[in-house]
């Protein structure tokens, strides 16, 4: 397998005085290039915590995370930030679009952070918005877009840098069933056409069943789910 992201014996413990809570313990995972998978589990099972660790947004108390063969624990915060910006995309339940900027300007942002020429950044952002079906909404601000359109814009922003892996935390959680299905299919389509690996945390078991692998997080441990029933 051509690994994009992996973790070994990953653990996360929260300490509050004498009370210790192990949220994750001994988690192993390998994600190949272009693979798409879902992580399911009960509320509070640590799904979001795992995604934050995989994305280098939080630090594990045990184990290692590697992105494109680079051990995150051996990188400085600046180096981790650079790796995230260059190799990873993030989509959340809430779109986190900046309300004062247009859809085009929001999607341009990661490219401008890379110090890309403004004209080229605008061209690439417009192209990605076209791919997600928002070619006619470039100059609309988030408040002028529907919930599904805002999430499509967030997906475009996450993918405009052509990351190796996209981490999505309940990306359809705020959408109605029909719109959620459309947005989920859009992510799978972009996974196929762009070759970006995709890890989706979701509580929607029907949507999870559309991915190549479904993993269940239970009592801090990750295992292949034989079924996507609750």
UniProtKB/Swiss-Prot annotation:
PROSITE patterns: ABC_TRANSPORTER_1, ABC_TRANSPORTER_2, LOLD. Residues 5-230 form the ABC transporter domain. ATP binds at residues 41-48. The keyword Translocase applies. It comes from the Bacteria. It is a peripheral membrane protein. Its main location: membrane. One of its GO terms (molecular function) is ATP binding. GO terms for biological process: lipoprotein localization to outer membrane; protein localization to outer membrane. The keyword Cell cycle does not apply. One of its GO terms (cellular component) is plasma membrane. It is found in: Cell inner membrane. Keywords: ATP-binding, Cell inner membrane, Cell membrane, Membrane, Nucleotide-binding, Translocase, Transport. Part of the ABC transporter complex LolCDE involved in the translocation of mature outer membrane-directed lipoproteins, from the inner membrane to the periplasmic chaperone, LolA. Responsible for the formation of the LolA-lipoprotein complex in an ATP-dependent manner. The complex is composed of two ATP-binding proteins (LolD) and two transmembrane proteins (LolC and LolE). This is Lipoprotein-releasing system ATP-binding protein LolD. It comes from Chromobacterium violaceum (strain ATCC 12472 / DSM 30191 / JCM 1249 / CCUG 213 / NBRC 12614 / NCIMB 9131 / NCTC 9757 / MK). The gene is lolD.
């Amino acid at each position: 397998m051509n690994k994009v992201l992996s973790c070994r014996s990953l653990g996360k413990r929260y300490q509050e005085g004498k009370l210790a809570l192990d949220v994750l313990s001994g988690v192993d995972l390998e994600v190949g290039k272009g693979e798409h998978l879902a992580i399911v589990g009960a509320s509070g099972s640590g799904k979001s915590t795992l995604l934050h660790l995989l994305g280098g947004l939080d630090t594990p108390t045990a184990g290692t995370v590697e992105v494109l063969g680079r051990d995150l624990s051996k990188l400085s915060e600046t180096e981790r930030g650079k790796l995230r910006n260059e190799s990873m995309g993030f989509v959340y339940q809430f779109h986190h679009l900046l309300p004062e900027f247009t859809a085009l300007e929001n999607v341009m942002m990661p490219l401008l952070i890379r110090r890309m020429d403004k004209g080229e950044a605008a061209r690439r952002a417009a192209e990605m918005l076209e791919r997600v079906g928002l070619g006619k909404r470039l100059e609309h601000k988030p408040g002028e877009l529907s919930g599904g359109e805002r999430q499509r814009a967030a997906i475009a922003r996450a993918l405009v840098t052509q990351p190796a892996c996209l981490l999505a935390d309940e990306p359809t959680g705020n959408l109605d069933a029909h719109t959620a299905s459309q947005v989920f299919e859009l992510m799978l389509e972009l996974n196929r056409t762009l070759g970006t690996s995709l890890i989706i945390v979701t509580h929607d078991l029907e949507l999870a069943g559309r991915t190549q692998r479904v993993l269940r997080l239970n009592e801090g441990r990750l295992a292949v789910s034989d079924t996507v029933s609750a």
